[in-house]
């Protein structure tokens, strides 16, 4: 009987191995499932290992620095320009474009010291992830309750100055898988202006050369080019300037996004030995 089940297990594993290598869709589902499983396991780990950092008010430093190594198996390589701009002392609001759950991997490559994340409140109910987020001093915001959202803005501005923290925000407010940027929401800019602290724009290149949820593919290799732009001061600005500030940040980030995406595509092609038309070079 034991031999029978051994044969069944071997047969099923063989089928999965074959499907993984011949079916793009199966390959996608297996890799993305294992990626989410990695997030779950990492969340369980940091529920314990993050406690000392949490007690010292160090933000999410350990969470992201360790997650970078947990995800080495993905084959995704990151190239970072301007890393030192995120490591400066003092509070700041870090804004970044939002594409998919793979953003966590990109964030891990460049995580600023003493930085926390702002997330939508619904994520506070994801098992283990929520505990890891709590120990990372994550700030949850209820986007559908204006009164609570505004209270969170005031709380963030106060805490960041008092504890010398940086805050990572996705100003688009939701994932954008279609390329480019959708209009920015004003929360991050309200916080920066209220606290009179600088904004540090971070731009991730487009992932669609190696990953796409609608396209159902997640290739074994991928290049992400990350660029940190110069900090944008907010001293002297008022809430009346928020709309103009938001548009200006979006414009400079969008220009950088086009440049880093082109570089990432070229790096991917070189890595795979492809010519400009996408064919393998001889």
From Swiss-Prot:
Give Gene Ontology CC terms. Answer: endoplasmic reticulum; membrane
- Which biological pathway? Phospholipid metabolism; CDP-diacylglycerol biosynthesis; CDP-diacylglycerol from sn-glycerol 3-phosphate: step 2/3
Is the Glycoprotein keyword given for this protein? no
Its annotated compartments are:
Membrane
| UniProt-listed Enzyme Commission number(s) | 2.3.1.51
GO MF terms, alphabetically ordered: 1-acylglycerol-3-phosphate O-acyltransferase activity
Catalyses: a 1-acyl-sn-glycero-3-phosphate + an acyl-CoA = a 1,2-diacyl-sn-glycero-3-phosphate + CoA
Q: Which domain of life is it from?
A: Eukaryota
The record gives the membrane topology as: Multi-pass membrane protein
**Transmembrane annotation, as ranges:** 4-24, 32-52, 122-142
Task: Give GO terms for biological process.
Answer: CDP-diacylglycerol biosynthetic process; phosphatidic acid biosynthetic process
The alphabetized UniProt keywords are: Acyltransferase, Lipid biosynthesis, Lipid metabolism, Membrane, Phospholipid biosynthesis, Phospholipid metabolism, Transferase, Transmembrane, Transmembrane helix
Q: Where is this motif: HXXXXD motif?
A: 98-103
Q: Which SMART domains match?
A: PlsC
Q: One Pfam family, please name it.
A: Acyltransferase
Note on domains (UniProt): The HXXXXD motif is essential for acyltransferase activity and may constitute the binding site for the phosphate moiety of the glycerol-3-phosphate.
Family stated for the protein in its record? Belongs to the 1-acyl-sn-glycerol-3-phosphate acyltransferase family.
The record describes the protein's role as: Converts lysophosphatidic acid (LPA) into phosphatidic acid by incorporating an acyl moiety at the sn-2 position of the glycerol backbone.
**What is the name of the protein in this document?**
Putative 1-acyl-sn-glycerol-3-phosphate acyltransferase acl-2
- Record the organism: Caenorhabditis elegans
Task: Name the lineage.
Answer: Eukaryota, Metazoa, Ecdysozoa, Nematoda, Chromadorea
Gene symbol of the encoding locus: acl-2
